[in-house]
Amino acid sequence: MIGRLRGIILEKQPPLVLLETNGVGYEVQLPMTCFYELPELGQEAIIFTQFVVREDAQLLYGFNNKQERALFRELIKVNGVGPKLALAILSGMSAQQFVGAVEREDITTLVKLPGVGKKTAERLVVEMKDRFKGLNGDLFNNTGDISLPTASPQTSDADIEAEAASALVALGYKPQEASRLVSKIAKPGADCETLIRDALRAAL
């Protein structure tokens, strides 16, 4: 199983990154909370991975540290939560925020995440609460604001907004809802990652 990759970032298309390691390009899907922290194109990155095999695909999910990966592994053990939904959950809020919502049994906040209904939110609270005790506390430290790159002047605001909406759809939002969220927070000159982050915050 592939558990860790170290290589050069060739492409970034939220939530997907293409990482070249020893001449091989690996496509890795990351939660947006991890995607924001990636280095720029052409720079080296270290990604901790979870390899998932389905009938129709073999997928790699990536994380910035072992603790985030551990939380992802626990999430996909919950009945009704697959890798795609786990990715959406960890994109919609940080690990620290998710843990806080579960410990407070905050169903109202959890159901605002894409793909999470009331029953799923209740299962998350019941099944995840006791599992946090076995995870490293470093996972829940607040790392502060993340500095994001500015948008390229060659890319139009409309193209950036379309890319952000496409990323939200990949995370589980319906196309109309994704477009509505992006339109709500769009501002001239904003880059794609900022729009995605602001849209996810607005959804909560």
Swiss-Prot record:
Residues 1-64 are annotated as: Domain I. It holds the Pfam family HHH_5. GO terms for biological process: DNA recombination; DNA repair; SOS response. The keyword Ribonucleoprotein does not apply. Residues 65-142 are annotated as: Domain II. Its main location: cytoplasm. InterPro entries: DNA_helicase_Holl-junc_RuvA_I (IPR013849), Hlx-hairpin-Hlx_DNA-bd_motif (IPR003583), NA-bd_OB-fold (IPR012340), RuvA (IPR000085), RuvA_2-like (IPR010994), RuvA_C (IPR011114), RuvA_C_sf (IPR036267). GO terms for cellular component: cytoplasm; Holliday junction helicase complex; Holliday junction resolvase complex. The keyword Chaperone does not apply. Gene3D superfamilies: 5' to 3' exonuclease, C-terminal subdomain (1.10.150.20), DNA helicase RuvA subunit, C-terminal domain (1.10.8.10), Nucleic acid-binding proteins (2.40.50.140). Has three domains with a flexible linker between the domains II and III and assumes an 'L' shape. Domain III is highly mobile and contacts RuvB. This is Holliday junction branch migration complex subunit RuvA. It comes from Yersinia pestis.
